[in-house]
Amino acid sequence: MKTTTIPNALSALLVLIYAASSLAGEPVYPLKVSENGRYFIDQKGNPVFWLGTTQWQLFREYKLEEARTIIEKTKAKGFAFAQVMLMGVGDGTKPNIHGEKPWIDNNPLTPNEGYFKNVDAVVQIARENNLVISMTMFHQRYRNYITIQNARAWAKWIAQRYQTVPTIVWSMTPEAKPEFAPLLRELAAGLREGDGGYHLITFKPDPAPHPAGFLHDEAWLDFSVMQTWKWVEAIYPMVTLEYNLKPVKPVLMGEGAYEQGSEYGFEVTPLWVRRQAYYSYLAGAHHAYGHNDSWRVLPTWKQALDAPGATQLGILKKIFLDRKEWWYLVPDQTVFASGGTTNGQVLNLAARHKDGRWVMVYLGSKASFSINMSKLTAGNAVKAFWIDPRTGESKAVGSFSNSGVESFSSPDGWEDALLILEPMR
């Protein structure tokens, strides 16, 4: 099989753009896993906050300038990662918007250069914007074409094609059944042969709700991804299960209920978008968002890029980045003296810095509760303030001692709320 390389002049230009973005404080990819296995870092060892979005059809259903709009708007909203299916939704044989099918004669061993040149162009735009694509190069619906016999060769080919592109993570989507294990191992082996281990590898079981835990011990699995679909109540326990597995690996809540999705039996409002995300992060995971109109490629896909839920997750990211050493977050429900809850769809959750430098409490609805102030061990005096997850606006509560128990009630009129406790400076 022939591999098309990026022309030298264009490659050099992209390197310059990439270097410029790095100097501006952008992460330097490819992505790596931290030494403690809890979070992601760039090539300089700097922690990277995984806030992802979902654009399954980006390679197949959009013109190049439309893809550019999506990527640029996605990055501007604060998302650093985008989940994309290499062959799009379906069985892997549907042509792209230009009429090009992925494979000649539907054979993965004879890839169609016309299809993959378009993928190349989209990948380059993502690289220019320093947006990492989590590229699903196998889906269980592709199983009639990607088989145990050709999986390694197919994976090696695609990995070689993008072996020097830093803004890629490899992903696969099997069913969570042991019968898929041999195929996943062949695919992973092909990816490693093709790119020499340059990119991280993961998989996300489909359908939901399932984590990747049934192959957690596999050496090639760099981090674990799960999906919960409409079962919001499954997020916290599933993340907790994965978080506590050994060896320690980062956990990503990769797919929940899409904003404005119509198939869940309830309206996925911005509040539900926020709840899913905060449940993920305060359980110790990372998170990916999705909008119904984007993955379905509805006529309103462009408006969906500015959906309230997407905007409010950008606010979430800023809230976390404002916490000193946010990457040392530890889920800890013992922060609550009373009022914490991890069961059901409306939760009250707490997490803290591993050394007690701050405490974060998320309330899924109006709530009264009490806090063990001794969980904040840095300094003697503690300041408390509310943050409205919808707007990011803060409201001072007061100062307290870091001993004993203090009671709090979230502000009236707020749908949900964050309470932050930090040492007085």
Residue ranges of model-derived segments:
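Bacterial N-terminal signal peptides that target proteins for export
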Residues: 1-12
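N-terminal signal peptide c-region/cleavage motif recognized by signal peptidases
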Residues: 19-20
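Non-catalytic accessory regions flanking glycosidase/transglycosidase catalytic cores in CAZymes
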Residues: 24-77, 356-357, 371, 376-397, ...
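Active-site mouth of glycoside hydrolases
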Residues: 28-234
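Short, flexible, glycine/charge-rich loop motifs used to bind or transfer phosphoryl groups or to couple energy/partner
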Residues: 72, 158-160, 211-216, 240-242, ...
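Extracellular glycoside hydrolase catalytic/binding regions
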Residues: 167, 173-308
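Aromatic- and carboxylate-lined catalytic core of secreted/periplasmic carbohydrate-active enzymes
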Residues: 249-250, 259-261, 271-398, 409-425
